[in-house]
């Protein structure tokens, strides 16, 4: 476990999955702590897929592979590359084990960088091969509801950098989406009200096409709790349906689950990223604690 700290925040990161474990301001914990009765993870990195592939199978060049939801990086041990008081970097490289499940060579580095009341999460994906590679990558951080009470309905609310005319798509079958049906996101007064049953019928709120770039999470009294900012083209918002869970996930994605029934090549799936030989994909998202 690596601990980063400054005068405001203390952050913990594990080498297993290069997964964020804790964000504390004083004695207050902001990151969900992984109670398995609700959801046993905290902030997994999703790679080389985001979400599910149809029937847990996908095809590359006519060959079929098996892949579980959200890929394998979250369950692998990363190598520590560098560490200071405010920054740590981990690395995962392709191996015989990964190539048996995902036929593209890769080098994935994940860094956490603390500054003031903010934490940058940095992703670098490199292509060491002489052919194009295709991948998806995403975040899945879970944050405590600050005013959680299982007996009460209200959980606070979200605002976005854009609060009008937002459209979302929904999970339909076997973890895959109906990509053609768009639903208007109801935001009276520019607020997405969070209730204990918000996700019981929809599973995930999924916004595509870079509709939003910032999510602000507010307490019931209207005070700001935290914010996420990002450049990812797809955003997922999720809490376990039917569990009255004490947390919510805000998920920037460079990717998305398959359409229902998709059986094409992996390189042609929705929201896949192509990386040329010797090139590097770079991205960062920022968690800002109020």
Sequence positions of predicted segments:
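A short, structured loop/turn motif at beta-sheet edges
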Residues: 81-88, 113-118, 147, 151, ...
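Acidic, contiguous internal or C-terminal segments within carbohydrate-active enzymes
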Residues: 4, 94-148
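Beta-strand-rich N-terminal accessory domains
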Residues: 1-57, 64-67, 210-232, 279-289
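Beta-strand-rich interaction surfaces with strong enrichment in secreted/lumenal proteins
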Residues: 109-111, 270-275
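Active-site/ligand-binding surface loops and adjacent short beta/alpha elements
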Residues: 132-134, 142-145, 149-230
């Amino acid at each position: 476990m690596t601990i980063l700290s400054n005068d405001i925040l203390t952050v913990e990161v594990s080498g297993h999955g290069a997964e964020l474990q804790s964000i504390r301001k004083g004695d207050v914990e902001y990151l969900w702590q992984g109670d398995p009765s609700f959801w046993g993870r905290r902030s997994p990195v999703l790679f080389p897929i985001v979400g599910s592939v149809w029937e847990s199978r996908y095809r590359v060049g006519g060959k079929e592979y098996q892949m579980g939801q959200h890929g394998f990086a979250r369950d692998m041990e990363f190598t520590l590359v560098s560490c200071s008081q405010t920054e740590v970097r981990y690395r995962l490289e392709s191996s015989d084990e990964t190539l048996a499940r995902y036929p593209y060579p890769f080098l994935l580095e994940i860094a956490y960088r603390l500054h003031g009341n903010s934490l940058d999460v940095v992703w670098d994906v490199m292509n060491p091969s002489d052919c194009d590679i295709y991948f998806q990558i995403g975040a899945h951080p879970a944050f405590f509801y600050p005013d959680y009470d299982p007996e009460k309905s209200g959980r606070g609310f979200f605002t976005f950098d854009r609060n009008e005319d937002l459209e979302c798509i929904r999970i339909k079958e076997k973890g895959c989406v109906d990509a053609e049906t768009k639903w208007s996101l109801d935001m009276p007064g520019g607020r997405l009200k969070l209730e204990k049953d918000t996700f019981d019928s929809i599973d995930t709120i999924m916004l595509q096409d870079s509709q939003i770039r910032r999510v602000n999470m507010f307490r019931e009294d209207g005070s700001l709790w935290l914010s996420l900012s990002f450049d990812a083209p797809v955003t997922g918002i999720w809490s376990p349906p039917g569990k009255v869970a004490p947390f919510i996930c805000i998920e920037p994605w460079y990717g998305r689950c398959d359409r229902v029934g998709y059986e094409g090549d992996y390189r042609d799936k929705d929201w896949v990223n192509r990386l040329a030989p010797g090139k590097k994909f770079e991205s960062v998202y920022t968690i800002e604690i109020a």
